[in-house]
Amino acid sequence: MSKLVQAISDAVQAQQNQDWAKLGTSIVGIVENGVGILGKLFGF
């Protein structure tokens, strides 16, 4: 869960700094961590 929070924090910070490459990778991190959490919930 902390990785998801960190990825969201990185995305917000990248947007504020207008660092579009970092924003893109942060969004990918959010998706990865979200899928991982859902996988654990549903036993994947």
Curated annotation (Swiss-Prot):
Compartments where located: Secreted
N-formylmethionine PTM sites in chain numbering: M1
InterPro entries: PSMbeta
GO biological process, one term: killing of cells of another organism
GO MF assignments: toxin activity
Cellular-component GO terms for this entry: extracellular region
Keyword Secreted included in the entry's annotation: yes
Keywords from the named record: Antibiotic, Antimicrobial, Cytolysis, Formylation, Hemolysis, Secreted, Toxin, Virulence
Predominant location category: secreted
One Pfam family of this chain: PSMbeta
Function, in words: Has hemolytic activity and also inhibits the growth of gonococci.
Family: Belongs to the staphylococcal hemolytic protein family.
Name of protein: Antibacterial protein 3
